From Swiss-Prot:
Record has Transferase as a keyword: yes
Keywords: ATP-binding, Magnesium, Nucleotide-binding, Transferase, tRNA processing
Organism, as annotated: Histophilus somni (strain 2336)
NCBIfam families recorded: miaA (TIGR00174)
InterPro entries linked to this entry: Dimethylallyltransferase (IPR039657), IPT (IPR018022), P-loop_NTPase (IPR027417)
Chain sites annotated for binding ATP: G12, P13, T14, A15, S16, G17, K18, T19
A biological process term (GO) from this entry: tRNA modification
Site features described as Interaction with substrate tRNA, chain residue numbers: T103, R125
Keyword tRNA processing: yes
GO molecular function, one term: tRNA dimethylallyltransferase activity
Record protein name field: tRNA dimethylallyltransferase
Amino acid sequence: MNKKSTAIFLMGPTASGKTDLAIQLHQELPVEVISVDSALIYKGMDIGTAKPNAQELALTPHRLIDIKDPSENYSAAEFRRDALREMQKITQQGKIPLLVGGTMLYYKALLEGLSPLPSADEKVRLEIEQKAEKFGWATLHNELAKIDPISAQRINPNDSQRINRALEVFYLTGQSLTELTAQKGEEIPYHIIHFAIAPERAVLHQRIEQRFHKMIEQGFQQEVEKLYQRSDLHPNLPSIRCVGYRQMWEYLQGNYGKDEMIFRGICATRQLAKRQLTWLRGWKSPIEWLDSLNPKSAKEKIIKTIKHNCK
């Protein structure tokens, strides 16, 4: 039986220091970085996604960054396909894939494979959105509760994106999202070592607030204004629904003032971090937890573990 090649998952909430740690690891280990981030895939969305800058990318190239235009969709299935392709290239070079990011659904899809969910259908989605405009998303959430009570319990009544997808799956297949996701996909053909970096809640909240203000100073508004001027972009696209971008877009629409936009952006980012941590706490595979306040200790722990596993 062939021994599986090793790959590293470096997971964690937004603003936890994953990118800095990955850059340090790239200097000391034979690793190549693959981004696991549903926002970093978009070209022209750099400041609001805290994308590594040109200097950092020159030092440590990240694969699966800047691969899509903001007008395009990108599914977990596409990520899995692309990530496995890049992982194979890296292992063929005699190096270790280091997967870094906070999009936990991507990690799950990569690790466990995907159940046979149908592709998005614009016609069905539009019909659902029109129904929501007429009756409200709360009514559609009630409809979902009758079709798929487990998904309805998990999905917030205000989460229009996920309600839409759950109903879309049922309309297209006649089966609930819960039924379909119970069908296992193909597991990843790698030995994965799972690391997670997660600051204390107060520290994380402070970092998120500081980073959002820094993004504003760096020209985040101007970045979104360029997107806002494009006729092919609208608030229902996954790119514009990204945390921070949605709030800035609504500010540019005149929905509220700048202070309110900043407040909402920070709150939305904190909520994202909370969801990411919930995923991590429920992670099925054993996780090596890293000290976010001591990057040197975190780096040394990973190096020691990798060297031990790759003997």
